[in-house]
Design a protein with these regions (language model features):
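Glycine- and hydrophobic-rich flexible loops that cap the catalytic core of alpha/beta enzyme folds
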Residues: 1-120, 124-127, 363-365, 370-415
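Active-site-adjacent structural elements in folded domains
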Residues: 3-10, 17-23, 176-187, 257, ...
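Secondary-structure capping and boundary motifs in well-ordered enzyme cores
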Residues: 16-19, 27-34, 188-193, 209, ...
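Composition- and surface-driven signal marking solvent-exposed, interaction-prone regions
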Residues: 39, 51-56, 209-219, 229-235, ...
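Short, well-ordered loop/turn and helix-capping segments at boundaries between secondary-structure elements
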Residues: 44, 48, 60-65, 206, ...
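A cross-family structural signal marking well-folded subdomains
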Residues: 52-55, 65-69, 78-79, 83-286, ...
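Intrinsically disordered, low-complexity N-proximal targeting/linker segments that flank membranes
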Residues: 222-343, 347-353, 359
C-alpha cells in the first residue's frame, strides 16, 4: 500500500488497465495422480515448492485415490495444513529461531524432527539422525505405498494431527524463551543440539517438559556435544527410551549415557575448568553458577537485539603475554610468562561479559577494567573485585568452579 500511495493518478490508471486485461484461467485435471504431479512440477510463483506444499499434496492424493477424500478427509488435511502453515509463519518470525534452529533452518527441519519422534501404526520408523529432509520425505512416500488401504485413512488422520501438534509445540518452546529463565538459558545460552529435538518436542507435546528435565537436556547436551565428542546417534536415539518407558525412562537413559561417557567426573570437571576459553558451554555454566539471582527480566536485558551475544572476557588480558612484561607478570603473582600461559585461558581468568563492554575493555589494565565491569548488566560482574585480582584469586576461582561442577552441576552423572 505504501508504494501505491506514492503513485500519480496516471500511473494508477495504467496499472488498473493492465489488471482489467488480465484473464483468470481455470485448469482442471480429473485424474488426482496427474493433478498432484502437475502441481509439484508447475510452479508459477518462481520459487521452489515448500516441503509442506509437497507433503500436503501427497496426502491429498492418497486421500482422493484410496480413501474417497470427498467424504471429509480432504477437508481434514486442508484444515490442518492451513493451521500448520500459520504456525510455521509465526516460527519464522520468532526472534530466536536462528539461534535455536540454526542459520539455515526451514520448515523441513521440523518435519524431519517429527519423523523421528513417533512410531505410527502401519509404517516403519521414519527417523534417522543422518537422514536429510528430502530423503525422509521420500521414505514417507515409500511407506505410504505399503500401508493397507483399510488403515490408510486412520494413518493420515493421526499423522496430520500429530504433525500439527509437533509444529505447535515447537512454537510454544520458542515462545517460552521470552517467559521462562530456564528455557532462555537452556535454548538460547546453551543452544541445545537439534538432535535432541525429536525427544524434546515430544515431551513438550505431552506436557512433560518441566524445568528439571530441560536442565537435564542442557547438561546432557554438554556431555554429548560440548566436551570433545559428538554423540549424534546416542542423542537422537533417546526417543526410543521415551516411547518405550516414558519420561522417567528417558531421564534414566540420559543419566546412564552421561555416566558412561564421563567415567571420571573429577577429570571431566578439571578439563572443563582448564579449557574454559575453548569450551562452547562456558556461558551456560557461568550463568548457572554465578547468576541464579538474575530473573527473566534481567536475563532478557542481555539480548537487546534478540540474539545472545555475551563474550568470554580475559580478566588478565592476553596482550600481557605479547608485551612480555616480566615485572608486571610477577606483580600479579606469576613466576614468569610460561606460568601465566598455563592459566590465561582457564575458568578463573574468565567472565561472561557483554560484547560492547568486552570490546571496550580489550587490553585495558585491571583498574580500567574495574570501571568497565561496573557497567555490566550482570550483578556478578558488577561486584567482581578486578583491582585486586591476582594468581591466587584466579586459582581460587578455578578450585571453586571445579568443586561446584563435581558436587552440583554433574552430581547426577557421578558413578555410584
Amino acid at each position: 500500500m505504501d508504494k501505491i500511495s506514492k503513485l500519480s493518478k496516471e500511473e494508477v490508471n495504467e496499472r488498473l488497465e493492465v489488471l482489467l486485461k488480465m484473464v483468470l484461467m481455470r485448469l482442471e485435471e480429473p485424474d488426482p495422480g496427474r493433478a498432484i504431479r502437475t502441481f509439484q512440477s508447475v510452479n508459477d510463483r518462481g520459487v521452489p515448492l515448500l516441503l509442506l506444499d509437497k507433503l500436503k499434496s501427497l496426502l491429498i492424493y492418497y486421500s482422493n485415490t484410496f480413501c474417497n477424500g470427498k467424504r471429509g478427509l480432504d477437508q481434514f488435511i486442508n484444515d490442518h495444513f492451513g493451521e500448520i502453515f500459520k504456525i510455521f509463519a509465526k516460527i519464522k518470525k520468532s526472534d530466536h529461531i536462528s539461534s535455536v534452529g540454526g542459520s539455515k533452518f526451514d520448515e523441513g527441519d521440523i518435519f524431519r524432527y517429527h519423523a523421528g519422534s513417533q512410531r505410527f501404526d502401519g509404517i516403519e520408523f521414519l527417523g534417522h539422525y543422518a537422514t536429510s529432509t528430502e530423503d525422509t520425505y521420500e521414505k514417507l512416500k515409500d511407506e505410504l505405498k505399503e500401508i493397507k488401504k483399510s488403515k490408510l485413512k486412520s494413518f493420515i488422520q493421526s499423522y496430520v494431527s500429530d504433525l500439527k501438534n509437533f509444529y505447535q509445540a515447537f512454537l510454544d518452546l520458542l515462545s517460552e524463551i521470552d517467559t521462562s529463565p530456564t528455557t532462555l538459558k537452556a535454548m538460547l545460552i546453551n543452544t541445545i543440539n537439534p538432535l535432541f529435538f525429536n525427544s524434546l518436542i515430544r515431551l513438550k507435546i505431552n506436557n512433560e517438559l518441566d524445568d528439571e528435565t530441560l536442565r537435564l537436556f542442557a547438561k546432557t547436551d554438554i556431555v554429548f556435544f560440548k566436551s570433545g565428542k559428538k554423540m549424534r546417534t546416542t542423542a537422537y536415539n533417546l526417543i526410543d527410551e521415551y516411547l518405550e518407558k516414558g519420561k522417567e525412562g528417558l531421564k534414566s537413559e540420559m543419566i546412564a549415557q552421561c555416566r558412561n561417557d564421563i567415567e571420571d567426573i573429577e577429570l571431566a570437571s578439571l578439563k572443563l575448568v582448564k579449557n574454559a576459553f575453548n569450551s562452547s558451554c562456558f556461558h551456560y555454566v557461568f550463568f548457572e553458577k554465578n547468576c541464579q539471582e538474575m530473573g527473566l527480566a534481567d536475563l532478557k536485558k542481555l539480548i537487546p537485539e534478540k540474539q545472545f551475544s555475551q563474550e568470554k572476557e580475559h580478566i588478565i588480558p592476553i596482550n600481557l603475554l605479547k608485551l612480555d612484561n616480566e615485572i608486571k607478570i610477577q606483580e600479579l603473582g606469576f613466576e614468569d610468562k610460561k606460568d601465566l600461559e598455563n592459566y590465561i585461558d582457564t575458568y578463573g581468568n574468565l567472565i561472561s561479559l557483554e560484547k560492547p563492554l568486552n570490546s571496550k575493555g580489550k587490553d585495558k589494565d585491571l583498574y580500567e577494567k574495574n570501571e568497565i565491569y561496573k557497567s555490566s548488566k550482570i550483578p556478578f560482574n558488577r561486584r567482581f573485585n578486578v583491582k585486586d585480582f591476582k594468581k591466587e584469586v584466579l586459582i581460587e576461582r578455578n578450585n571453586k568452579m571445579e568443586k561446584w561442577l563435581i558436587n552440583t552441576f554433574f552430581k547426577d552423572f557421578a558413578a555410584h
